Structures are given as structure tokens and as C-alpha cells.
Amino acid sequence: MKSSLSLCQRAANAASKYERYVPSCGVFPLGFKVGSIATGVKKNGQLDLGVILSTYEREGGATAAAVFTTNKFKAAPVVASKERLAKSEGRGISAIVVNSGCANAVTGAVGLENANKVVQLVEQQLGRKDTTLLMSTGVIGQHLSMDKIEHGLGTLLNNDDAFGNDFSSWLSLSKAMMTTDTFPKLISSRFTLPGGTTYTLTGISKGAGMICPNMATLLGFIGTDLPISPSALQNILSSAVDRSFNCISVDGDMSTNDTIYMLASGAIDTDLITESSESFPLIKAQVTELAQNLAQLVVRDGEGSTKFVTVHVKRALNFADAKVIAKTISNSSLVKCALYGQDANWGRILCAIGYAQLGDCASLDESTLNVSFVGVGDSKGAELNLVVDGVPNVNINESKAATMLADTDLKIVVDLGTGTEECNFWTCDLSHEYISINADYRS
């Protein structure tokens, strides 16, 4: 199937997003170095293999946490990494390997053998067993090109000059994770805690299609130089993912490979962070904010998308109900098509709200329901009420609606009026180009 956009149009769209969302510099956490290489798995000499190394050996090395896909057909790298993480109890992790172009998913015993061989190659080089984790992304149902992977890994690991902890190295790593992405996703920030300790967070992610995680194809990594206990790190990451990567949808499909890792190198000389540390809630909030920014970049890069949409559900009885309503709206193909067509079809939004699988139906009371469009981009500050106290606005200002829906950014606000909890979910529209990209995916 041929694309509805010309190659020139696709390139122009990609260039625009690259200029808008890719940084030109950054700060990066101590205790890491990263490298990447083109093995030939991807076409045209594109980077397709990367390695993150923990270089600080405080109390045995980096602590680790992870959140994996809940898809029943878990990919071989997910299975292999879960086993290693369990053995290590989140301590002493030395490396993370990421490859793109082949997901190594639904590949049976051979796929698992190949995944284990990849990590063993790294562990042999480093001289440390059961300390390497793996991420893979690409076409499902195909085996890894082990000759290319093995040669690429050997070349990379034997070249110290290929590794660094600078902007160029991290940007190249994020490029090595890309498949249908139009731009690499890299964020870094530096924070100072109340006691005066300054630390750094860096996050990278990939994803543009098959995005509706419940921890799509979505991969991510967050690194920090703080010393954090494994249990505290898992608490931080799980909470952050639940409010970020688990609150995005491009197409409603959950991948076999979803993986988010977080490593804490401990290179900053400060007390170990645990759940009882005074700074723990603040660090947790800062990691969540970074994860949300990373997750939003995935949606902004949604395959064929023209709009970035925030679905804000507020005044629900509980967070779970707010989230399921926001997710149901975000996953609705009819809502997404209406957004692409710039059609203020609020009936589709109400329909989605009505079939949301709520844990407590008391969260939804038709008489207190309010739904509106809120301008975010050029229409910032504008609001269009679609439903007020359960009564539809039959005299919608179509001209105002058209102006708001023409923006690239939009917010849909659903006020349930039954409680105090809220949730933000991020989605995009569904275009002809999405179909073209995925119809041509393996060609």
C-alpha cells in the first residue's frame, strides 16, 4: 500500500518534529557511559545496537528497577531480563543492551537462546555474570541476525572510544532504539534536593506505533547518579510509569516488548535513598515528571499523527476510574478519527465514557457530567462546552470548534463531578498516514 504522503512531505514532517523536540545539549548522570553501532540489521547504515554501562562500583554497582509488558506473549528479551533482575534482586547491574530492527518476540526456544547469548556475550566481556539486561524492538516473529549482533557487540565493546557520557553519545543511543520513530527522544535534568545534594536524571525512550502500554512498541530508560535502594527505586519507577507511560495511547495496541528500566549508579556521595528518606517523595515526583515528558514525546511522534491531545478526567471518585475513562476516550478509533477530521463530534466522546469499564459505577453520574474542549496551542485559553450538567450543548459554535480543532494541541476535559481524583492521559489522532505506515511496515 502506498503512502498518502509523499516522501518529501514525510521528511518535512519529521524534520519539523526533530527541530521542535530534540535538544541540542544536556547534562548526564555520573557513573554511566553509553555507546552505539550500526550492525546492518537496519537498512542504510542506521544505528541499531546500543549498550549502557554502569561504571561506578559503589557497594557492588548500580541498583535497578523495571516495569515490563503485561502482554501474554512476552518477548524473549523480556523473559531473559526478568530472570536476571530477579536473580540480582536489583543490585549490581552492569549493562543494558538494546537492539532495534528485530523484536525477537514470538520466536520460541531459539529466540530465548539468542537473547541469553546476547547478554552472555556482554557479561563475558565485563567478567560479571547475571548483571546484563536486554531490550529489543522491531518486527515480531523474526529471529535476531546473530552474526550481525555478535560482530557488532564485539566491535563496540572492544572500542573504548565508542563510549561516552556526553550529549552526542546519549543522542546516538536514543537513535539506535528507533524504528518508525521520526525523532530520538532524550530528556535530561539536574535537580538540587533541600539538603543541597545536586543530582541528574536522564531519560530516553522510543515508540511511535503499537502504543497503549500497560507496562507499546515502547522502550525506555531512566538513569540517575543518586544512590537508591532497589525497593525504593522500584517504588519510584512503578509509580512514575503508572502516571506516564501507562497513560498514553497512539493506536490501542500493547506490544510484546514493552520495557522501562531505571538504574541508579550511586556515583553521588550522599546517603542511600530509601522509602523513609525525607527526600524520597520529592525524587519520586521529579522522576514522574521526567517520565511524563518522555511519554508525551512518544505520543507527539505517533505514527501519522497531526494532533497531540490531552484527555483530562477530573472529580472522579478514585484515580482508577478517572484513568479508565481517560484511557477509553484515548483509545476510541471514532474519537481519534473525529479529531483528525476536525469534527466536534462530542457524541463519540460520551459513547466512550459510557462503555468505560469502571470499578465503581458511582463515579459516573449523568446529571453532574461536564465535557469541554480547551485550547492549548494557538487557541490557548479558549473553551468550548460540549455537555453541561449532563445536558448537551446543541448550539455549538462550529466556527470556534473548527478553529480549536485545527490546532496541533488540544485538551478534552471531562468533569465527572462525583469526587476529587483526576488523571491525565495523552493520545493523538488517527490519520490516513497511520494506515499507510503500518500497511508498508515490513516492506
UniProtKB/Swiss-Prot annotation:
| Catalytic residues, chain numbering | T217 (nucleophile)
One GO molecular function term?
A: L-glutamate N-acetyltransferase activity
Q: How is it modified after translation?
A: The alpha and beta chains are autoproteolytically processed from a single precursor protein within the mitochondrion.
What Gene Ontology biological process does one annotation of this record name?
A: ornithine biosynthetic process
Its job: Catalyzes two activities which are involved in the cyclic version of arginine biosynthesis: the synthesis of acetylglutamate from glutamate and acetyl-CoA, and of ornithine by transacetylation between acetylornithine and glutamate.
Q: Name one GO cellular component term.
A: mitochondrial matrix
- Site (Involved in the stabilization of negative charge on the oxyanion by the formation of the oxyanion hole) found at T137, G138
What assembly does the database describe for this protein? Heterodimer of an alpha and a beta chain.
Task: Indicate where this protein resides in the cell.
Answer: Mitochondrion matrix
Pathway annotation from the record? Amino-acid biosynthesis; L-arginine biosynthesis; L-ornithine and N-acetyl-L-glutamate from L-glutamate and N(2)-acetyl-L-ornithine (cyclic): step 1/1; Amino-acid biosynthesis; L-arginine biosynthesis; N(2)-acetyl-L-ornithine from L-glutamate: step 1/4
Query: Which organism does this record belong to?
Result: Eremothecium gossypii (strain ATCC 10895 / CBS 109.51 / FGSC 9923 / NRRL Y-1056)
Name the residues that bind substrate.
T179, K206, T217, E303, N438, S443
UniProt protein name? Arginine biosynthesis bifunctional protein ArgJ, mitochondrial
Keywords, comma-separated and alphabetical = Acyltransferase, Amino-acid biosynthesis, Arginine biosynthesis, Autocatalytic cleavage, Mitochondrion, Multifunctional enzyme, Transferase
Q: Name one Pfam family in it.
A: ArgJ
Q: What is its EC number?
A: 2.3.1.35, 2.3.1.1
Stated family:
Belongs to the ArgJ family.
Q: Which InterPro entries match?
A: Arg_biosynth_ArgJ, ArgJ-like_dom_sf, ArgJ_beta_C
UniProt catalytic activity: N(2)-acetyl-L-ornithine + L-glutamate = N-acetyl-L-glutamate + L-ornithine; L-glutamate + acetyl-CoA = N-acetyl-L-glutamate + CoA + H(+)
Q: What else is known?
A: This protein may be expected to contain an N-terminal transit peptide but none has been predicted.
Q: Which domain of life is it from?
A: Eukaryota
Location (main, coarse):
mitochondrion
- Site (Cleavage): which residue positions? A216, T217
